[in-house]
Regions:
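Long, low-complexity, compositionally biased intrinsically disordered regions
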Residues: 1-140
Length: 140
């Protein structure tokens, strides 16, 4: 079922400036905070895929543009997190507003984070720091 990322009773976090990096944040932390802030403002619909067959897989739909993005979230620092958007692929942060929206949705809905290794083996492109091809061995 679709869930929005915004709630009326949410407590507001301190606003992060788009123009000046706060002294208490690294450049990476600042950029991720900006994406989290954008995720809080935008009205995304989040669909969780079949948790038995595809644990950790989500679809994020922008309610204004109707663009849909595939997101895989396996935990805060997981190397297997992924989003199909260009920001995720080019920023080398390992995050984007869609991934941040999923994290907010999981937190607000008290959902379980699937941090386990998938059963299948795959060859994938890692977008963190620098692009590299990686092999993930599945559990089967």
């Amino acid at each position: 079922m679709a869930k929005n990322t915004r709630k009326k009773d949410d407590k507001k976090l301190p606003k992060v400036s788009y123009y000046c990096k706060p002294d208490n944040l690294t450049l990476k932390q600042w950029q991720i905070a900006l994406r989290r802030q954008t995720a809080e403002k935008e009205n995304f619909a989040i669909f969780e895929h079949n948790t038995k067959d595809s644990p950790g897989y989500y679809s994020v739909v922008n309610s204004v543009t109707k663009n849909e993005y595939r997101v895989v979230y396996r935990g805060e620092e997981s190397v297997w997190n992924y989003c199909s958007c260009m920001d995720f692929k080019t920023s080398q942060l390992g995050s984007c507003k869609h991934l941040e929206a999923v994290k907010l949705w999981i937190s607000r809905n008290h959902r379980k984070i699937y941090a386990g290794r998938p059963s299948y083996t795959s060859l994938y492109l890692s977008y963190k720091k620098k692009k590299k091809i990686c092999l993930r061995i599945g559990t089967d």
